[in-house]
Amino acid sequence: MSSSGHPRFKPASQPPLQWSEFEKVDMRVGVVVEATDFLEARRPAYKLTIDFGPLGLKRSSAQITHHYRPADLVGRHVVAVVNFPPKQIGPFISEVLVLGAYNEAGEVILLHPDQPVTPGSKIG
């Protein structure tokens, strides 16, 4: 399937953001310290505990089971939005949104820095 045929690849349909709106999004690099199966989730997912350095440990639910195993995620750097309000997902509270790109099959591929950075480093 070509990238234009998948719904995740449609052109932006939202109005442009103002720079001041973008500046409100706090994206940081963290290191996964724990990853377990989220058995209670409706769709296959993992429960992640992520170290964001001075921001501390934060938890997230991530639907990334197609390309990652829990053991492979521990020690991995990820990028997440850290200033959304906590979200209840079944019995779990997700505190951050781990970011990824969708491939043509609609599966999430995690974003990560290509050079070493300190946990808690701000994305800008």
Task: Set out the residue ranges of the language-model regions.
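Phosphate-backbone binding interfaces of nucleic-acid-interacting proteins
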Residues: 1-124
